Amino acid sequence: MIKRVSDSYKNHLVAFTLGPLLKLIEAFFDLLIPLFMKGVIDLNQYDSPELISNVFTRRLAEFIRLFGTWVPSNQALSDALIGAVIILVMGIIGYVLTMIAQYIAARTAMNVGTEVRESLFNKIINLSKKDREQFGTGRLQTTLNSDTYQVQQGVLFFIRLVARAPFVIIGALIFSFILDWKIGLAFTVIVPLIWIVFFIVLRKSGKQYVSIQSSLDDISTKSTDDINGARVIRAFNNQENENKSFKTITETYETKSVNVHKLNSLINPIVFAITAIVTIAIVFLCRETLLDGSDSEKVVISSTIIAAMAYLAQIFFGVVQLPPVLLDIIKAGVSRKRIDAILTYQSSIESGTEESKDNIVIEFKNVCFSYKDDSNHYALTNINFQINKGQTLGIIGGTGSGKSTLINLIERFYDTTEGEILYKGINIKDYDLSKLRSEISLVNQKSSLFRGTIKSNFLMANSSASDEQITEALKKAEAYEFVSQYEDYLNHEVNEGGSNFSGGQKQRLCIARGLIINPEVLILDDSTSALDLLTDKKIRTTLSAINDMTKIIVSQRVATIADADLIILLDKGRAVGMGNHKQLLDSCQIYKEIYESQIKKG
């Protein structure tokens, strides 16, 4: 995995060197062709290379004559054929070099894109919950997709054209001086003018692309929120307001995009105008020879104009190619910075290296936590408890009491603001993070199933799990009964989000998946809320028989946590009651009221 986008560039230095080099050789052949054309014309007029005044053209004419006479009866035709063959050979060589360079560019761009995308994905899935919230889902999605694509395009155009286009422009300028210093001077005037236009446009465009990518983040965030919350939106009949809100965001993106394209669209018309003026200037400079010169002089000046027009065309096409190339490279630069910001981000949750086998599995010591690092607004305040190996901890409380926050701290999705958490006697911050996550299995209330099959969802948690192990986990989670009814059993298809299962079925599958890794600690975060009390009871009875596994059960139902060895009642982030079920009924009025109210409801 790479640490920066530039690391991927370094992995492909040969391609970044060889690709442009091949394009430069191909471009050099292209630059020679107009001079060969002029050499053939001048040789036909003077019959002997020695009579040609232009030294460079004379040398090319002499080179043509080295191949002898192919048509003895017609030297002019022979020279023309030889010149045509030479030009054809250069064209074929240039074509072959271009194809090789194009392949190198495409292959390298895909490789860089793959390396960046894989490294970025790996970084994102290893970010803590706090880190992901800081970046925002929209930003992460846009960076993974759009920004990676922009970097890929930047690599493609860099290898293909970033060296060739300037080389052709400068080369055509040099060869125009070889043709005629006045023509070269005219060309020299237009290149700085064009570059001034480029500089102004590209400077403004670069700033606008940063804003455009930010708007893409907003679109991604909004669309993700609305798609995930579509049922809620429909339930409140709020479709129209959401449509208006989304329309506002997309129109902002559209306005920014249109503005930058308007700016970029100025380049070609300006280049066309400058080129047209130079064409007129060339004809004007050669007017005296064309009108009053001898026949030989007229032919020579005509060949010069033909070659000059060819070089002007090369300058023009080189200039036309540069804006999209440079714009893509600028966009790639913006995207590279956004990607590097994530790849180089120092996570607030750093892994430790220590391990232990202490009998006390989890211990909270004066733990306080605030989502905004604000001591005046703690989500948890002075939490103290310990749970031994094989015991069951029950956590109960109303909405917003801090139940999920406490679980997030155990999983180390966040770090404590004050106090410390010990895992197997070691400060959880010093414990190896990957080992911690492999030993603790969390099953959330929101059952997350992934598109694929039932088996593939289990293999995601434990890649070496056998069918027998999966079946055993399904039985423990009371999911075997309905899964076994499918003809394809474990190969039964799972739609996106598990939409082809009921809420209770999804929860049982997720509990089974949590068991497949044989965790040392199993956390059920209100993950039986969609189950009936009988099924809930069966699962808890099965789990209680696993003596070497510590269980943490979060629920709003007293019946679900009544058999726990230790129950913590949370209210507004504080532990207002702690003990077993009987102790809390005797000592905690709030717990007793919750229990009695639920008993009355049946």
Describe each PLM feature range.
Residues 10-13, 126-130, 146-155, 159, ...:
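An intracellular "coupling" helix at the cytosolic face of ABC transporter transmembrane type-1 domains
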Residues 1-33, 37, 42-84, 97, ...:
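Membrane-integrated ABC transporters
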Residues 11, 15-28, 157-211, 283-295, ...:
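Transmembrane helices of ABC transporter permease
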Residues 21-22, 26-45, 80-137, 141, ...:
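Juxtamembrane helix-loop junctions of ABC transporter transmembrane domains
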Residues 358-602:
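ABC-type nucleotide-binding domain
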Residues 95, 116-125, 129, 138, ...:
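A structural preference for long, well-packed, hydrophobic secondary-structure segments
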Residues 175-189, 259-338, 342-343:
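Helix-loop-helix
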